[in-house]
Amino acid sequence: MTDLQSKYSKLAQEYSKLRAQNQVLKKAVVDEQSSCNSLKDELKQKEQSLRRVEQEMDSLSFRNQQLMKRVELLQEELLLSESKSKKSRSKGDSPSQVSLQAQSVFDEDLHKKIQENERLHIQWLEAQEQHQQQEAQLSSRLQQLQEEAQEHQAQLEELSCRHAHTIHTLQEDKATLEVKLQTLEREARDCRVRTEECQQQLRKYQSEVSSQLKHSSSVIQEKVPFNDTQLSDYNSLNVPAHNRRHQLRAREVAAQALVFLQNLVSALLNFHSYSEQRVQIYPRDSSIETISAVNQKFSQYLHENASYLRQLEEDLLQLHQSITEDLPAATQKFCTTNECLLSSLASLTSSSGKMATFFSNSLDFLTSCAGYSPSGALLKPLQADSVMQSKRRAAAYISSVRQARAESVPYGEALANRHILTSSTESREGLMQQVLQSQQKISRLEQEKEHWLLEAQLAQVRLQKESARIAQLEAQVCVSAPQSQLCASAAESPVCVSAAESQVCVSAAETPSEPALADAPEPLQDTSVVGVLSIRSCSESSADQDSREQLIKTHYMSRVSELTTQLQICDSKAVHFHAECRAVAKRLAMAERSRDTLGEELKLANQNITRLQDELSTTKRSYEDQLSMMSDHLCSMNETLSQQRETIDTLKLSAKGNAKKNKSR
């Protein structure tokens, strides 16, 4: 049973471990799902940011194309203006040459700006190609990560399904165990009811059998004494039966009588001594009359009665000592030493208590500094070196105590951690206690069931045996009645004693011969009824013991076979659960490794995205700066072109005026 209980406890521990691992795996699955959701959210954010960047790139490319077209138009206008200026240069005078030189300077600046714009445009195209390549790489990498995340999600779903299956099976096992427990409780109740009924019947039969046995034994003791038919001289050697209960009862009665007699003797002695003292003192104190002869005789009788009472007490004490056995007592030296030790301990406690009260009452006076004041002013005397050293030590101790403590965990965080720890430990301990209590209850109920089943079987066997024994006793009593009548008639007629005895012997030898041959293999049989009863009771007790041992053996063998089958089933289940747990642990380790790799890759992808965002922001800023510079330059070029047009128009007007003047001349 102890091995089974240990194995059941091991199975319960493994079940609790599996439940704890299942909870951990559930938490891991939830964490993985939350991490996958967060990764999906981050991916959506990154896609939105990429779309924004692409839109900005498209807008910038469109703006750049517009600027290129504007520059081309300006270049064409510049070429036209240059051609016109060349034509007018051939016709114009020296002031037009100065303007042409200025125009050539502006043209050179414009040509440099155009070259710089082309170079920047080429760099922008290269950067755009690099950005597209990196975007393609990141998109492929993102697709790969999405596929891996889907695989990881599938693995997590598979693990969750398996754990749900295991949980379902464990819940079914728990339900079956509860059903078994309820059935066992019902069977235990039924067995209790049956055993109570059997016990009541057994008590009733025992009372009936005991009453009949008492009656038959009294009849046998009174009517059928031990009588040796062969040698009558042996009848004088009969020894009375030994009764231990009677001796114990006699000892108790003697002890009680001794106590009562001691009390009575002491009371009588006190009464007699005080009465004698009063009788003798009263006349002498009053000095009225002398002691009468009656009082003197009464005091003499009291003295004699006291001597008799003391002798009676001593004799009864010797009787009690002869009956009882004295236990070894402690020596006088040990008792005196113990009393001295107790007295010294009491004196020590009292003296220490007095010292404590003394110091507590005079603490203020002892701590105050002693001084003297000869002329009104308090003068403090010099203190001893030992007092100064003790003060220094006290100051050092106070300084060491007042040192700042090291930083610790904040109080709120510590309370939260303690609450979490206590809740987790309480839940775990509560579950463990529930499991242990249920196991103990199951084992206790099984033991009670087995016990009551065995008791019921034994009670049935006892009932059968007692019924058979009652029948045998009734038959024997019926047989013994005519024998007692024959003995009585033989006692009345002394002449026919030998003939009656011979007839009784023949009848007694003939009647018990058949059951003796059937039950006992012994060749010699007792002719008396007492011998037959004793032999039958011994055979019945041995048969009862054999049947009881056989029943117990068969019951325990069947129970051991059942428990071995249950143990084999539990071992197979435990092996299966252990294999599943190992597989789940391996998959969990693989999932954790894949999660770590995915986390690292996600970190790298985030780093690349942040780097690209930084590069994009820098390129965007540079392009914005360049566009602002180009816009400023175009504004300045427009202003110069407008000024040049104005100068060209003025030159044209002046040229026309000069031509008209020349024509008029």
Swiss-Prot record:
Q: What is known of its domains?
A: Coiled-coil domains of PPP1R21 are essential for RNA binding.
Q: Which residues form a coiled coil?
A: 1-84, 125-206, 426-477, 586-627
Q: Which organism is it from?
A: Danio rerio (Zebrafish)
UniProt cross-references to PANTHER family, sorted A to Z: PROTEIN PHOSPHATASE 1 REGULATORY SUBUNIT 21, SMOOTH MUSCLE MYOSIN HEAVY CHAIN-RELATED
Name it: Protein phosphatase 1 regulatory subunit 21
Q: Can you say where in the cell this protein is located?
A: Early endosome
* One GO cellular component, as annotated: early endosome
Question: How the protein assembles, per its UniProt entry?
Answer: Component of the FERRY complex.
Provide the GO MF annotations for this entry: RNA binding
Q: Which domain of life is it from?
A: Eukaryota
Q: Which UniProt keywords apply?
A: Coiled coil, Endosome, RNA-binding
InterPro entries from the xrefs?
Answer: PPP1R21, PPP1R21_C, PPP1R21_N, PPP1R21_six_helix
Function summary? Component of the FERRY complex (Five-subunit Endosomal Rab5 and RNA/ribosome intermediary). The FERRY complex directly interacts with mRNAs and RAB5A, and functions as a RAB5A effector involved in the localization and the distribution of specific mRNAs most likely by mediating their endosomal transport. The complex recruits mRNAs and ribosomes to early endosomes through direct mRNA-interaction. Putative regulator of protein phosphatase 1 (PP1) activity. May play a role in the endosomal sorting process or in endosome maturation pathway.
